[in-house]
Amino acid sequence: RDRHNVFLWVAIIVALFTAPVRFTFLFGQINLLLMMLVTIDCCTSRRRWWTGMLVGLTISIKLTPMVFLLYFVCRRDWKSVGMTLGSFLVYNLFALLVMPSTTRLYWTKIIRDSERIGAYHYCRNQSINGALARFGLHDSSRSTVWFIVALIVGLLIAVIVWQLVKAQQYFAALMLNGIAANLCSPISWDHHWTWIVPVSYTHL
């Protein structure tokens, strides 16, 4: 056990020097916080009545965590799926009450503006779409190829996640689900890849 603890602390220290963690702190990002909320919500041996509320909160902050519905679906935890979607709706209704103009602006205009995120071909976009963009594909053809490749990769990962859940390897399933989000997302900057950090823990 002592040896395991030593390895764990070494992994934590090393993680602080990895690009995703360093750039998260450097750019003042919240990816580590979102990862923590999702992990707390999902990695439990027993289901709580509020399971899904934290994932719903992360989706309200950033839409990408919606991919973690796959984890609940693979566990056949339909109650948590409903709690996630319901809490997401409640959080956004609350935002609409508190900041009506800002909330309407986001859902009617900002969410459709892909240019606000950055250039797809930029080297720090480590998603499948970013790799295709750096091959020089035109936007229309790249979008089609990206959709097909991302769909295939997503389906393959979904099968593996389901197998891990079936084997009760919940932590590994969740980590792989997070990596799938980074791979298949249109843009995944290097500081988005915080999900690769806890993967090392599964091998200790």
Please tell me what each predicted stretch does.
Residues V55-F72, S185-H192:
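Transmembrane helices and adjacent periplasmic/lumenal helix-loop junctions
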Residues T202-H203:
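Conserved small/polar residues in nucleotide/adenosyl-binding loops
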Residues R1-T51, R75-V197:
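Primarily membrane-embedded glycan-assembly and transfer machineries that use lipid-linked glycans
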